[in-house]
Structures are given as C-alpha cells and as structure tokens.
Regions:
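Auxiliary tRNA-acceptor-end handling modules of aminoacyl-tRNA synthetases
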Residues: 1-266, 284, 288, 299-354, ...
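Ordered core of a single globular domain
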Residues: 266, 270-272
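A generic secondary-structure micro-motif detector
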Residues: 271, 377-378
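Conserved structured catalytic cores and adjacent interaction surfaces
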Residues: 294
C-alpha cells in the first residue's frame, strides 16, 4: 500500500488485490504527557482485525469478531449458519475518490480510521500504571480539535500514521468511586494497519495442563455434539530454513529469527544480562532441532531506516515507572493464535521487588545479600532471570 499526507488528510492507495484480506490494527506510544497511561515504546490496544470490501463505490472496513466460533465438524450447513450469524460489522466506510492510472488501486481518505477514539483503536494498554493492577478503570475521550496527523509512512506489509492525540481521562476506582475526571492527556502515537498472513498458520489446540497463553474459541463440532469451549495456543511460526537437514536431525536456523532490540535508554550495565536472559531460550529450541532462534541486539546508531515503533520491530524498553515487574505485550493473529509481535517493558522499580525477594529467600545462607546495595553480579543474575521470564511470556508461555 502507498500512503500520502496532504493538508491533514491521509490518502491511501488501497490495492484491489488486497480486498478481502485480513489486516491487524496496532498502536505504539512514542511519547506522552502521562506515562501512567502507557509507557513510551509500548504497543497497546487490542488485536483488532479489519477486512476491507467494496459496497458499490464505497470501501468499507469490516471488523470480524475476535472470538468467532469455529466449525471442526466439516459440516457445510453448520459453516453457513455460523457465517450468517457472524457476518463482520462495518466499522468505517470510505468514499472512493479516484483510481490509480492502471486501476490496480483505489484512492481513499483513511483519516477517519486512524484519527478516531473508540475503544477498539485507542493506544493505551489496560495494564498500565494508572490502572493499579485492574482496580482503576480509565475512560479516554478523544479531543479531535486538539489532535493532528504528524506524518505517514509505509513498509512492505503495513502502513503507519504518526499523530498527536489529546484526550480527557476519567478514573474510576472499582467501578464505583470517581477518582478524577477530565484529566488532560496528550500522546504522540503511531497507529499501524498490518497485513496478516495470506495463508493462516495451522492452529494448535492448547492443553490446559500446560501453562500457555491461549485464544478462547467456541467449537460447533456437529449436530449431535454440544458446543465446546476450546483454546488455541498462542505460538510463533518457527519453520526450518533447511527442511532436509532438519529431517536428518541437524540443528538448523529458523526462516525468521526472533530479534529483540534493547532500548538505547536502558542502563548500559544491564545489557549483557538482558541479552543472556533472552537468548537462554535458545537451549530449549535446540531440543526441537532449531538453533539461534532468539537474537538480541542494541538499537542501531547509524541506521536511518530503523524504527523502534514499527510493528515489525520487537523491543525491550526501559520505562521510568513505579510498576515493579517486567511487562510483555503480545499481538497475535486471532484466527490462529500465531504470535506476530512480542515486546517487553522493563519498569525501573522492578529492582526494588527483586531486592526484597532475594533478601527474603536467601539472606540466611548468602552473606553477599546482607547489604543495602547488591553487588553487580547478583543484580545481573536477577535481571537475567526477569528477562528470561518476560521473553518466555513473549513465546506464549
């Protein structure tokens, strides 16, 4: 897709060949007036899918249900019944303004999709600091007159719109007590429309005995069977680059490595432990025939094309937040459970909890921790363990 910004409009040359394809909407926060609503670098929002279709001379964005039931019976009548009962609703419509000279693309103004304030496209994660672990709900109201499009860009598989968004936010404690009302919030956000795989990955049923991140589905498995609840495991599409060598039992690299980039704002002394913690998972992948699946790099210094806020880029970011843990955000293809992006946020206050946990667990037997400041060796071990856990979550565990 090609995208243009002209006088505040967002003109997209939408390929006719892309009609009917599934796309994912995602958001990334670049900077904000309140990091408690979402940390810079954090991918927020929900895994909303859109499918674009033509109705007369109008391009419409349909939004399939995230939890559309599946039909494992193979019964054509059940399939038709499910389709009739779950036809995706129209989320936005766009008047076709022109066609490209070769008629291969439709020109539409998509400003209404990117500059809108519904819960489906807002960039703020539910797990941010102002949510106080779920006790406080926040209602964000977009102020369109105080918001603007800053720039647009496109890559091979997605288009991006950078915008400055202003909101008023209401904070409600436990659904009953109004803590704050109309709190002003302004954030620079990149919103992205990403093309999902044309050939969906084969789903894998999750086993409840294993600790996996899952996607809940209802299964209509036949007229004589009850409707069952099943779960798809969220997992990466790890495929061997050399199938013949893989079948011979040799270790092979995957077609696509999982590359994490370390934030340039991260304390430099942490970087070796972050790299060691993330790449420690490669030992597990070797048990199933893969090597060098996970790779950790620092932000490139002289690469003008590198964009840490792109959906194609997985990052390990540093956040000046009181939250006391590492947070992992996963974006997946809700049709199959395929993980498409996993990014990690290291909150500054994580160190305090690591200190308290290590003191409580080992102070009786380890004299090295009987101090107010841990030695670098111990602090590094704790950071390495926290990163290994966060990356494990990003792998779907």
């Amino acid at each position: 897709m090609t995208i243009h910004k002209v006088e505040g409009k967002v003109y997209v040359e939408f390929p006719v060949a892309m009609l009917g394809r599934e796309m994912l909407f995602a958001s990334s926060i670049e900077n904000t007036s309140d990091g408690g609503e979402g940390a810079p670098g954090q991918l927020g929002g929900t895994d909303v899918r859109f499918r674009f279709e033509m109705i007369d001379s109008t391009l419409v964005a349909r939004m399939p249900l995230l939890s559309k039931p599946v039909n494992t019976s193979g019964d054509a009548y059940i399939a038709r019944a499910l389709d009739n009962a779950h036809n995706p609703g129209i989320f936005k419509s766009f008047k076709v303004l022109a066609c490209t000279p070769d008629s291969s693309a439709l020109v539409v103004d998509m400003k209404g999709l990117f500059l809108e304030g519904s819960a489906f496209t807002k960039p703020f994660p539910s797990t941010s600091a102002n949510g106080y672990y779920g006790f406080v709900s926040r209602d964000h109201s977009l102020q369109s007159d105080k918001s603007a499009i800053l720039g647009v860009s496109a890559s091979e598989n997605h288009i991006s719109v950078c915008e400055e968004l202003s909101y008023t936010v209401d904070h409600t404690l436990m659904g009953a007590y109004n803590m704050y009302k109309d709190v002003p919030l302004t954030a620079v956000v990149t919103k992205m429309l990403c093309i999902l795989p044309e050939e969906p990955m084969t789903p894998r049923l999750a086993d409840s005995r294993l600790g996996l991140t899952t996607q809940l589905k209802s299964d209509y498995s036949g007229a004589t069977q009850e409707v069952k609840s099943i779960r798809y495991a969220k997992r990466w599409r790890i495929e061997p680059s050399d199938s013949a060598a893989y079948r011979r039992g040799e270790l092979v690299r995957p077609v696509k490595q999982l590359v994490f980039y370390i934030d340039s704002l991260m304390p430099v002394k942490w970087n070796p432990y972050i790299k060691a913690g993330a790449e420690s998972w490669n030992k597990a992948f070797e048990k199933i025939g893969f090597k060098d699946v996970i790779c950790v790099k620092e932000f490139p210094k002289n690469d003008t094309l590198f964009n840490a806020n792109s959906f194609d880029c997985m990052t390990i970011r540093y956040s000046a937040s009181w939250l006391n843990s590492a947070q992992t955000t996963i974006h997946s293809d809700t049709r199959t459970g395929e993980i498409l992006n996993a990014s990690i946020l290291i909150n500054a206050n994580m160190i305090s909890v690591q200190y308290a946990d290590r003191i409580g667990a080992t102070v009786a037997i380890d004299p090295r921790v009987r101090t107010t400041v841990f030695p670098q060796e111990i602090q590094g071990e704790l950071i390495q363990a926290a990163i290994a856990q966060a990356v494990g979550t990003g792998l779907g565990l």
